[in-house]
Amino acid sequence: MAVEPDKPGVDDPGPGRRLGLDVGTVRIGVAVSDRDARLAMPVETVRRETGFKDRDKDDIDRLLDLIHEYDAVEVAVGLPRDLKGNGSSSVKHAKEIAFRIRRRLAKDDRMKEPPPVRMVDERLTTVVATSALRASGVSEKRGRSVIDQAAAVEILQSWLDARHFALNGHSPSNVGDEVREP
């Protein structure tokens, strides 16, 4: 199941906050960026309610409310892939939620122009998020309640870093570094 993620910087909506989503079968982790689109921060974990054959439920409504609340100019939905880049079995869930958000935003008259909903490569984000939580001393029980938010932060931060590189030719970590001749 080969599914290609979107490329940052293409049709970029410009400055503003971005929302990042880690879609699971039980929960959806949510993260938001600062207005400069440099730093991702956790927001909340939304309980997943909408299935493939269901009408939109409270989870979709909550995600739309967050898009409006943060005035998001772009939404980055994690695209689960294995290390070879192939889509995992969870791809269908992420694509379904992205589709429903796009559809609802297109009909939403609260926004002049709906923000683009991007599919973002999320390889190893949950592994990285879990390791970071354990390293910071978060208990396994407490970790379950925030792991989806941490994964959403990883997804969004990777998108922000790649976006910055695509638009500026360097990563945010070396902003201000000078290239010195030998």
From Swiss-Prot:
Entry-linked InterPro entries: RNaseH-like_sf, YqgF, YqgF/RNaseH-like_dom, YqgF/RNaseH-like_dom_sf
Enzyme Commission designation: 3.1.-.-
Subcellular location: Cytoplasm
Keyword Hydrolase: yes
Domain of life, source organism: Bacteria
Major location (coarse): cytoplasm
SUPFAM superfamilies assigned: Ribonuclease H-like (SSF53098)
GO cellular component: cytosol
GO biological process, one term: rRNA 5'-end processing
Gene Ontology MF, one: nuclease activity
Pfam families to which the protein is assigned, alphabetical: RuvX
Leading EC class: hydrolase
Entry keyword Nuclease: yes
Key words of the record: Cytoplasm, Hydrolase, Nuclease, Ribosome biogenesis
Record family assignment: Belongs to the YqgF nuclease family.
Function as written in the Swiss-Prot or TrEMBL entry: Could be a nuclease involved in processing of the 5'-end of pre-16S rRNA.
NCBIfam families: RNAse_H_YqgF (TIGR00250)
This protein's name: Putative pre-16S rRNA nuclease
Protein species of origin: Corynebacterium aurimucosum (strain ATCC 700975 / DSM 44827 / CIP 107346 / CN-1)
